[in-house]
A protein has these predicted regions:
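Compositionally biased intrinsically disordered regions enriched in Thr/Gly
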Residues: 4-5, 24-269
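Sec-dependent N-terminal signal peptides
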Residues: 6-14
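C-terminal motif of bacterial Sec signal peptides marking the signal peptidase cleavage site
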Residues: 19-22
Length: 269
């Protein structure tokens, strides 16, 4: 492997590693973007609410003096697989920094094995953004597209929240109750993020095919770490927090975009 990292300091906004043979890393994109556009929906009315767009960040600015970030990319030799992910730098606890960076890379690239991506035939392009960070936790969002050899595509979305104090994965179960989220998912109050009226209406109907117990079990197993020893059982749902709100994904049919993102706002419940 070849590794070339470019240190990039940037403002961390409030708001995941499969090692294939012959892969390399190189510097890549700024990770300061964030997904904050929300769409409120009911069966009778579709209402869109766009969150304010964050101003452009100064690449040299560092809000949190506890650490800086680096942008790194995992690539196959033929560049058919490209996964961008952040790395931490200049932490006072260098052992913890190494542990966290290894965890970030492992989780970020685990999508390759989980989806059975063949770099000689398939193409996978994943970009990342830091969605929430402070001295205690780091939340990373990964978004991209998998194009199979037969031309079919799949929208990819996953997240990784890490406890910076102990270098462990955090999941939905660490900041929300799975059953409460499942009941909300099936309620009339549900809100979806960035979903069209057509997708929203289809999801509101299709969700009824599953029970509270079904969704509770899915959400109890949301997020990293990967639950199987072979690393091939990827979580069905991923979550993160942004501005006090809880976001989590639900898998749907390909014609609906492969996933929808549900927004739960504790302050309004």
């Amino acid at each position: 492997m070849k590794k070339s990292l470019k240190i990039m300091g940037f403002s961390l906004l409030s708001a995941t590693a499969i090692l294939a043979v012959g892969c390399k890393k190189k510097s890549t994109t700024d990770l300061s973007s964030t997904y904050t556009t929300a769409e409120s929906s009911t069966e009778k009315e579709i209402k869109t609410t766009a969150a304010p767009t964050a101003p452009a960040q100064n690449p040299s600015a560092v809000v949190d003096p506890a650490f800086k970030t680096q942008s790194s990319t995992y690539q196959s030799d033929n560049k058919n697989v490209s996964i961008a992910y952040p790395k931490l730098a200049e932490m006072q606890d260098t052992a913890m920094q190494e542990k966290i960076n290894a965890l970030i890379e492992k989780n970020a690239t685990s999508i390759v094995s989980a989806l059975g991506v063949d770099p000689t035939k398939d193409k996978l392009d994943i970009q990342s953004s830091i969605n929430n960070s402070d001295n205690s936790r780091l939340s990373i969002v990964y978004k991209g597209t998998l194009t199979k050899a037969d031309g079919s595509t799949q929208a990819i979305f996953y997240t990784n929240t890490i406890d910076l104090k102990n270098g462990q994965d955090l999941g939905l179960k660490d900041f929300a109750d799975a059953e409460t989220m499942a009941k909300y998912l099936l309620s009339d109050d549900i809100q979806l993020s960035n979903a069209s009226a057509d997708v929203t209406n289809k999801f509101l109907e299709k969700r009824k095919s599953k029970s509270v117990e079904d969704y509770t079990n899915m959400l109890k197993n949301a997020d990293f770490p990967v639950k199987s020893s072979d690393g091939k059982t990827f979580p069905s749902s991923f979550s993160y927090q942004n501005g006090g709100d809880i976001y989590f994904t639900v898998p749907v049919d390909h014609d609906m975009g492969d996933y929808v993102t549900v927004i739960y706002s504790p302050k309004t419940k």
